[in-house]
């Protein structure tokens, strides 16, 4: 309620002074870059939301997942612990249907198809954007059309030569050290080291139990280094990440301090990507090269149960190349793109065979713009073939999407249809004892109708949508309770509404979002779980961010509400997870070369969990000092 009161007082003031503000936004500084980004976003036909640099700096957030959770239609799965894996799900389509792109190049994981957003820092980003379906612009790669939803991470280009250093200390013995050197507008080098003990207390209470304990085996040590070079139309981005962490596991009733998970994980990730884009009159060209090398080592050694002992290393590589060309004539444009990806996976598991995959995609897009009308249609052809012992059959598929919008003054009416699929991952097909080489692709279809309003200080988006997922890939017991296998089983449908509001006035920025969705299981009309809610899909969720920027001061208050969620496929088996509300605050002040920031997350110390029996931290603090030379 207190956040609503802030909104009710600030928004009328915005309306009263909107035209004066509009004149001020021609000034180029960090405070007013929000409007610049939003203006560019209105050129896209598909629904989209953006968090800009000004909001990123003011948020009490540490990684990309912390920023995305405030966007409409987004669900974050956080597997507890300060170093727990964080994946994103958009409109209940599944995390493997969400493509994450860094400067237009996809971050991939051929092994399991998901991206851990906790590994990617916000410190080097200019903006984080979410597009339902995909962007609608020339020179997109074919891979960008292959996702049901897309997240774009835009790297921040430096504007001067500077050395930035920072140190942060927070709850649970959390230390962060950051160093960034930028040279003119040519590029930067950014490094960060993080350590946390992660031993936060928790209280888990249900109708049947009341458990109090301390999270064990939740420590994390991680180091990240990345650089980016800008040379005219050329951009070269290199990323390196290494971590050593504990995997705390789900809590055990009344025994949380006696039986501690001992799983440990070592991660090492590297990629280097080179992209070039230029225009020659009506022609446009784009080329991309990328190489990635990822290694994961997992070990668990339970003294009291040797049957679950594990010590395995996974190694995967990825090489990617793409070329796109576009041509425009008056109101018509055409774009052709083709890319090729080579991925391989090795593991020191018994009976595991080396496998590599060749994945080729080709897309043809047609754009038409006339006055306020914008039309776009794309056809995508995918060919995928694996090479290993007893390999799965090659895959050939054609999918398409169509988008349309009409703009009249400040109003835009839009709609899109998109059909796309995900290829079974290498784990789905070949994982020892569980993989199934006969799996079919998992298809999604989406229909969206919405409108947007954009005028001076205010932007509003409202969308209604329908989607369904066919042939869901799930792991089910096939030969008794001790033999599980990957199967195509499941049909779900989702009806939803997304609302987002952005308002900017002088020193105030307000961002509101809300989602309603009805996501149901429609697999087997005779089954007990037919028409039950899909696991971890809340019906209602809301978020609000208020940011204040004035001279050297910055402050933000963010609040997020998530409705109750069922966590079992059959809703009657157990009670749903409780709804939760989480509030974060952050205050900062900059004087010349020094910035001091203080933040508090989960201000009211509300216990909650995103995943069943994976409690999240309660109230926690952090103080940060930053130096600029």
What is each stretch, according to the model?
Residues 228-245, 264-407, 412-416, 458-464, ...:
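Face-selective signature of the C-terminal outer-membrane beta-barrel domain
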Residues 468-470, 561-570, 576, 588-629:
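C-terminal beta-signal and adjacent terminal beta-strands/loops
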Residues 122-162:
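A beta-strand signature from Gram-negative outer-membrane beta-barrel systems
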Residues 65-109:
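Extracytoplasmic beta-strand/coil segments of soluble accessory domains associated
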Residues 260-279, 392-394, 399, 403, ...:
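Outer-membrane beta-barrel signature, preferentially recognizing the C-terminal barrel domain
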Residues 328-331, 335, 369-376, 466-468, ...:
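Gram-negative outer-membrane beta-barrel transporters
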Residues 17-57, 95, 132:
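Short, acidic, small-residue-rich periplasmic hinge/interaction motif at the N-terminus
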Residues 136, 152, 160, 182-265:
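Periplasmic-side early beta-strands and strand-to-turn transitions of outer-membrane beta-barrels
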